[in-house]
C-alpha cells in the first residue's frame, strides 16, 4: 500500500481546508516546492497535488508551482483541481505529471472523461468526493444526488488508473478514515481505490492494510502529516510491512 502525502495549493501556498471549506484555511507553508522536497526526502514515493484555486476557477491557477514540484521531486505526481479540457490534461502530462484527477467533470461531462481515458490510457484518475455517500462537485460546493458507488461503477472498463475516494465530512478533521465506505467501493469495482479524508493516526493505516486484497492500493494523508500526528517515515514503514 502506497502512502501519498497531499499538497493542497491556494494562492501559491501549501494549505489545508477543514471539510473542504474555503473559509477555513490553514497555511502550512509559503513554499510548496520545498514542502514537496521535504516529503520526498522523508521517503514519499508519490505525491498528491490539488490546485484549490483551479477547482473553483475551472482551469489551472498554480501550474508554475506544480511544474517546479514535478521537476524537483523525481517521483510520480498526481494533480487534481480545475481540469476540464483535453488541452489542460496534455499540458500537465507534458510537464511530467503522471496522473490527472478528474472529479467534477466525471459527473458533469462524461464524454470529456471518456475521451481523456481513450487519449491518455492509464493517466486518468477518477476523483470521487462524497458527503454522506453522495458525490460533491465544483470544489465541494455543490452536492449531487448520485452516490459514490454509482459513479465509480459507471466508469468501469474505461481504462481509469485509480479511484480516489474522499469522505469530505472527515477531510481535515482527523476523525479517522472512512474504512467501511472505502471498502464497499473497492469491492464493488475492478479499479484500484485510494483512500482519502480523515486519516488521523497510524491506526487508520493499520485498519486499511487488511483491505489491500479488496483493492485498496493507497492512502492519501494531509493534515495528520502537517500537524505531526503521523510521521511519514513511520507510515511508509508500516505500509511496507504488510
Curated annotation (Swiss-Prot):
Q: Which GO terms describe its molecular function?
A: 1-(5-phosphoribosyl)-5-[(5-phosphoribosylamino)methylideneamino]imidazole-4-carboxamide isomerase activity
Instruction: Answer whether the UniProt record assigns the keyword Cell wall biogenesis/degradation to this protein.
Output: no
Please provide the record's keywords in A-Z order: Amino-acid biosynthesis, Cytoplasm, Histidine biosynthesis, Isomerase
Q: Return the Gene3D superfamilies for the record.
A: Aldolase class I
> Could you name the domain of life of the organism this protein comes from?
Bacteria
Can you state which reaction this protein catalyses?
1-(5-phospho-beta-D-ribosyl)-5-[(5-phospho-beta-D-ribosylamino)methylideneamino]imidazole-4-carboxamide = 5-[(5-phospho-1-deoxy-D-ribulos-1-ylimino)methylamino]-1-(5-phospho-beta-D-ribosyl)imidazole-4-carboxamide
Query: Which E.C. number(s) belong to this protein?
Result: 5.3.1.16
Q: Which residues form a coiled coil?
A: none
Q: Per its UniProt record, what InterPro entries does this chain match?
A: Aldolase_TIM, His_biosynth, HisA_bact_arch, Isoase_HisA-like, Isoase_HisA-like_bact, RibuloseP-bd_barrel
Active site residues according to the UniProt entry? 8, 129
Functional pathway: Amino-acid biosynthesis; L-histidine biosynthesis; L-histidine from 5-phospho-alpha-D-ribose 1-diphosphate: step 4/9
* PANTHER family documented for this protein: 1-(5-PHOSPHORIBOSYL)-5-[(5-PHOSPHORIBOSYLAMINO)METHYLIDENEAMINO] IMIDAZOLE-4-CARBOXAMIDE ISOMERASE (PTHR43090:SF2)
The record's family statement is: Belongs to the HisA/HisF family.
According to UniProt, the name of this protein is 1-(5-phosphoribosyl)-5-[(5-phosphoribosylamino)methylideneamino] imidazole-4-carboxamide isomerase
Species source reads Syntrophus aciditrophicus (strain SB)
